[in-house]
């Protein structure tokens, strides 16, 4: 391959036919930054991930033993003739976010591991009882201290053997009696060890063994030394000195110790600062930082209801059952009944209903025909906790789980670590405090640390700090200055988690690796895009090949090489329409090239809607980093919430507004972030969240089933004369139910053939030929087409086929209008891209009848979308707003922002420096706000009108 006039090695893909790829050949240069672009569904991911990465992964797994391959499961060979020049491949995608609650930004980047090492080697311990520095002495130092303090005095030397624990300790006393020890000190009182001696087993006891009683003299130092060493052996490196005259106690230890209280710590090791280790984790929350507690508000969400009307959610409405008879008895005890609204019940009655009572209740019920049936009541809380028990089934646990709320651990305050770990400090900060800092703040703190450390300790810390600073710099380079090390990995967006993995890879300093990234610019404000591009170039310059699936204009123009897949999507895509440098591409006339060169652009609306005069007003929002903000959302408009990454957009919309509305409209149990008050919810009757998650959890889900049109199609086939003659019901035409489906493949259309030590092979079902249905079902036809033929049609074909059946046509036509005419009606959702899934969901909403009072929430809807796809998306959103609905989207894409009616811009920065409303109003108004970073970029965009 010739690149910039020089011959270079490349990854050569020959005859790729994965998904919709049309037997394409393409060369991708080594040691360059290559962008693969094209419409959503054109075949970009099919080439990058399902062909190049899949083959690289398969080759890697083939180096394993046959046994290991069988255990791991082997990737199927992609449908490609040949791939040459393939170096080891690492994929950094969006869908691999770690959902483990123990995974944090710090653990996944290994920065926290280095911090643990730093604290194990260079921290200072402080007593969590007295707050004084812990000390550590050698045996020689302890001897000199004893001689200095007790010269000429009579003392007992004691070895601690039991510390504040329950038990009778009969065997322990007998063991020491046989060894020749005569006395012990039990709970501060000296006692002789007698035969059969034991303590109250149900009380906590502290026991010290009397090792020796002597008068301290420097002339008899050998006896003192022997006694001290013996006491250390018996007391596990700890001893006490009891002054015979004053009864004063002094503590000594070879480990870290508080001389005032006797508290001792083990010598710090890295695992002592790990919340994933028993030695470091908080005993209350087991290192999670939170505990799940039963929430009374979730059990009784609507206090205006009575118990009989379903006010107690776990019970539902009144049934003639024992639990209601028991609660009726409690109500009678407090002078009320089951029809009394919960808000009017005495607090004592509510307490007994929730927590139970030991008092025997007089059960009165006509069904029992008795008034003399007495029972105690354990309470709803205990019942729910029993359902949550590990021995309960998953269904019961899921049911019980809805009544729990996650609360910050009361013992560690969310730090995840035990008391000891939290009382080791470096320059006044413990490891949990450092982990809670923003990356930028932590970097500054560490960079200044050498000014605050003793030279001896800095010599130990220097290399560790350098390693941490290097990794933090990589995170700053990819725009993650606002996250903290203790941020849970599960809470990261796809783009954030991908950039964290990118920073980790840069830090690993691998060479000769092929990296494949899926839209790393997701969730990144335009201000930070150049930092990301510089990071990718740094990865390239270290001697790696970087392939990026991307639509970002800046990324494309800064690439070394561009591969444009198209010309359209689905069946009309899958071709390489251009491959070359950005400069060469600007001279072309592909769809992508036209948008890059400015020949095509998304138009700016002529007018901005002012809305219907109603507002949703949120007051006092202060969750996460929101700074007690007040915000108004004008209804009947297209609103865009903007701001740099980490400024609080998702906290405001997804974690505050959406749960508030869902609670009000649907009695949802999801807890919103803290806020003051909300007004205007009476002006909406429905909230719809449209994201890019898959349509369903299995490949059986498809556009026809999701939009509901498949039900209409099945009903059409059921009402055909042939079906009526045969007595077929709608279930006959479902591939999910027995009867009409092919039972050989269970309606899948294919069979998985196990090859033992080779990859499993998916082959079309020999019984149905991949059609999913049995022969009898396929004999029923409409206009010459069976149900399987209909599912195999593209949306465009189906629109023509069902042109005379409005019930079906209207739903399918909406799919066509949102730009999905190329996908099949029965296409498995697992093969749809994120952008395609989102548009299927939007189409399903457009097809529904609405009252014009629906609120649509979209989180970064442009993810995975080409310029042309964004144009189609905006036209769909326009239709929703024209019907009187409200659309709120959070996005960084300037094409979306410039088309909004109203903008709410958060900032000014991310993390702790964000969370304020810096600008609001029309795009033109925000563009003129000098303190708005978004406004600066918007001004440039609007000037190109």
Model-derived segments and their meaning:
Residues 1-945:
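Conserved phosphate-binding elements of NTP-dependent enzyme cores
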């Amino acid at each position: 391959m010739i690149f910039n006039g020089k011959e270079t090695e490349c990854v050569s893909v020959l005859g790729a036919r994965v998904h919709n790829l049309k037997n394409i050949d393409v060369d991708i240069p080594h040691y360059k930054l290559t962008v693969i672009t094209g419409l959503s569904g054109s075949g970009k991911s099919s080439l990058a991930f399902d062909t190049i990465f899949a083959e690289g992964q398969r080759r890697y797994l083939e180096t394993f033993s046959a046994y290991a391959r069988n255990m791991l499961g082997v990737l199927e060979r992609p449908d490609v003739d040949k791939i040459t020049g393939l170096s080891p491949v690492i994929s950094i995608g969006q869908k691999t976010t770690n959902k483990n609650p123990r995974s944090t930004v710090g653990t996944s980047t290994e920065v926290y591991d280095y911090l643990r090492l730093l604290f194990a080697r260079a921290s200072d311990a402080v007593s969590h009882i007295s707050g004084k520095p812990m000390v550590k002495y050698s045996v020689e130092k302890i001897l000199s201290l004893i001689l200095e303090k007790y010269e000429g005095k009579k003392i007992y030397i004691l070895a601690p053997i039991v510390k504040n624990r329950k038990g009778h300790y009969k065997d322990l006393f007998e063991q020491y009696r046989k060894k020749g020890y005569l006395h012990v000190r039990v709970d501060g009182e000296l006692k002789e060890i007698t035969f059969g001696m034991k303590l109250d087993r149900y009380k906590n006891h502290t026991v010290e063994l009397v090792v020796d009683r002597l008068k301290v003299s420097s002339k008899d130092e050998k006896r003192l030394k022997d006694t001290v060493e013996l006491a250390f052996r018996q007391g596990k490196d700890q001893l006490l000195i009891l002054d015979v005259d004053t009864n004063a106690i002094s503590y000594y230890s070879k480990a870290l110790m508080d001389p005032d209280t006797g508290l001792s710590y083990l010598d710090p090791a890295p695992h002592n600062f790990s919340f994933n280790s028993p030695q470091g984790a908080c005993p209350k929350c087991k290192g999670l930082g939170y505990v799940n507690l039963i929430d009374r508000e979730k059990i009784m969400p609507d206090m205006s209801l009575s118990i009989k009307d379903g006010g107690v959610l776990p019970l539902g409405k009144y049934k003639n059952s024992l639990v209601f008879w028991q609660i009726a008895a409690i109500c009678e005890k407090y002078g009320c009944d089951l029809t009394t609204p919960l808000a009017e019940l005495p607090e004592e009655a509510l307490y007994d209903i929730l927590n139970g009572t030991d008092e025997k209740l007089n059960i009165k019920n006509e069904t029992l025909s008795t008034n003399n049936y007495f029972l105690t009541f354990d309470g709803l809380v205990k019942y729910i906790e029993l359902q949550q028990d590990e021995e309960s089934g998953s269904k019961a646990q899921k049911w019980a789980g809805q009544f729990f709320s996650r609360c910050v651990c009361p013992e560690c305050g969310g730090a995840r670590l035990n008391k000891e770990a939290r009382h080791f400090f470096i320059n006044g900060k413990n490891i949990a405090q450092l982990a809670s800092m923003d990356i930028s703040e932590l970097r500054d703190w560490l960079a200044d640390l050498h000014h605050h450390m003793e030279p001896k300790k800095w010599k130990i810390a220097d290399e560790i700090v350098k390693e941490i600073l290097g990794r933090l710099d990589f995170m700053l380079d990819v725009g993650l200055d606002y996250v903290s090390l203790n941020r849970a990995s599960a809470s990261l967006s796809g783009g954030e988690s991908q950039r964290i993995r990118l920073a980790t890879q840069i830090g690993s300093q691998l060479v000769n690796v092929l990296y494949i990234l899926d839209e790393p610019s997701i969730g990144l404000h335009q201000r930070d895009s150049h930092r990301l591009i510089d990071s990718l170039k740094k990865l390239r310059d270290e001697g790696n090949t970087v392939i990026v699936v991307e639509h970002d204009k800046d990324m494309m123009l800064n690439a070394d090489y561009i591969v444009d897949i198209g010309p359209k999507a689905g069946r009309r895509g899958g071709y390489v329409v251009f491959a070359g440098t950005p400069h060469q591409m600007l001279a072309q006339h592909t769809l992508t090239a036209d948008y890059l060169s400015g020949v095509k652009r998304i138009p700016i609306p002529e007018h901005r809607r002012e809305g219907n005069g109603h507002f949703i007003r949120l007051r006092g929002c202060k969750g996460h980093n929101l700074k007690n903000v007040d915000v108004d959302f004008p209804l009947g408009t297209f609103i865009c919430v903007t701001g740099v990454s980490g400024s609080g957009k998702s906290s405001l919309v997804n974690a505050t507004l959406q749960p508030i509305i869902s609670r009000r409209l649907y009695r949802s149990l999801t807890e919103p972030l803290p806020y003051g008050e909300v007004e205007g919810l009476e002006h909406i009757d429905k909230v719809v969240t449209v994201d890019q998650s898959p349509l369903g959890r299995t490949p059986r889900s498809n556009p026809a089933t999701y939009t509901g049109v498949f039900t209409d199609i099945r009903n059409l086939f059921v009402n055909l004369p042939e079906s009526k003659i045969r007595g077929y019901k709608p279930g006959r035409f479902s591939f999910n139910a027995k009867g009409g489906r092919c039972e050989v493949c269970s309606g899948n259309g294919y069979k998985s053939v196990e090859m033992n030590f080779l990859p499993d092979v998916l082959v079309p079902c020999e019984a149905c030929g991949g059609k999913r249905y049995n022969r009898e079902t396929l004999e029923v036809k409409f206009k010459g087409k069976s149900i399987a033929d209909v599912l195999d049609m593209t949306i465009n074909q189906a629109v023509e086929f069902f042109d005379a059946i409005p019930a079906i046509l209207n739903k399918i036509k909406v799919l066509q209008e949102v730009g999905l005419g190329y996908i099949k009606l029965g296409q498995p959702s697992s093969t749809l891209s994120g952008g395609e899934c989102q548009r299927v969901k939007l189409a399903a909403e457009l097809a529904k009848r609405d009252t014009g009072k629906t609120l649509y929430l979209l989180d970064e809807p442009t993810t995975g979308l080409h310029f042309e796809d964004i144009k189609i998306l905006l036209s769909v959103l326009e239709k929703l707003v024209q019907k009187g609905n409200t659309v709120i989207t959070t996005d960084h894409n300037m094409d979306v922002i410039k088309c909004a009616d109203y903008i709410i811009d958060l900032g000014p920065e991310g993390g702790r420096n964000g969370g304020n409303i810096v600008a609001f109003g029309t795009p033109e108004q925000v563009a003129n706000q000098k303190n708005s970073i978004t406004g600066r970029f918007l001004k440039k965009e609007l000037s190109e009108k």
